[in-house]
Amino acid sequence: MDLHQLYLDRLRQRDRIEGNFCYLFEAAVVLETAQPPQDSRDLVAKSLREELHAHEQEIHKLKDIVHLRSKDAEKLNDEIISLNIENSLLQDKLTALQAEYDKLIQRWLAKAQSEADAMNQGLA
């Protein structure tokens, strides 16, 4: 009987060990069923990465636009400066021509006055 009892004890021990293995394999099955949320997280992460990439491209385009506009603004400022210089030179030239014109008018008036005075003396 001892052998029979020993055999039964060993079978029970084996069943307990296999039962423990069964719990381990159930956990593995649970992990496999838990993977679809991981897949959805992967999909969310992928869509977020794509959105981030799209935003980075948009930022790059906007930086290019800002750079281009700053160059345009710089060119326009240079144009304004050159036009201001040209305007200043033309204003100086206008002032000089007006002064010369005033001198010519004064000389013409003086000449006309002297001719009028000479005619008046000739008549008197």
UniProtKB/Swiss-Prot annotation:
GO MF assignments: Atg8-family ligase activity; identical protein binding; protein-macromolecule adaptor activity
InterPro entries: Autophagy-rel_prot_16_dom
Membrane topology category: Peripheral membrane protein
Classification via Pfam families: ATG16
Compartments it resides in: Preautophagosomal structure membrane
UniProt keyword list: Autophagy, Coiled coil, Membrane, Protein transport, Transport
Record's GO cellular component terms: Atg12-Atg5-Atg16 complex; phagophore; phagophore assembly site membrane; vacuole-isolation membrane contact site
Biological processes annotated in GO: autophagosome organization; autophagy of mitochondrion; cytoplasm to vacuole targeting by the Cvt pathway; piecemeal microautophagy of the nucleus
Primary localization: membrane
Role description: Stabilizes the ATG5-ATG12 conjugate which is necessary for autophagy. The ATG5-ATG12/ATG16 complex is required for efficient promotion of ATG8-conjugation to phosphatidylethanolamine and ATG8 localization to the pre-autophagosomal structure (PAS). Also recruits ATG3 to the PAS. Involved in endoplasmic reticulum-specific autophagic process and is essential for the survival of cells subjected to severe ER stress.
Stated family: Belongs to the ATG16 family.
Assembly, per entry: Homodimer. Part of the ATG5-ATG12/ATG16 complex. Several units of each may be present in this complex.
UniProt protein name: Autophagy protein 16
UniProt source species: Eremothecium gossypii (strain ATCC 10895 / CBS 109.51 / FGSC 9923 / NRRL Y-1056) (Yeast)
The organism's taxonomic lineage, starting at the top: Eukaryota, Fungi, Dikarya, Ascomycota, Saccharomycotina
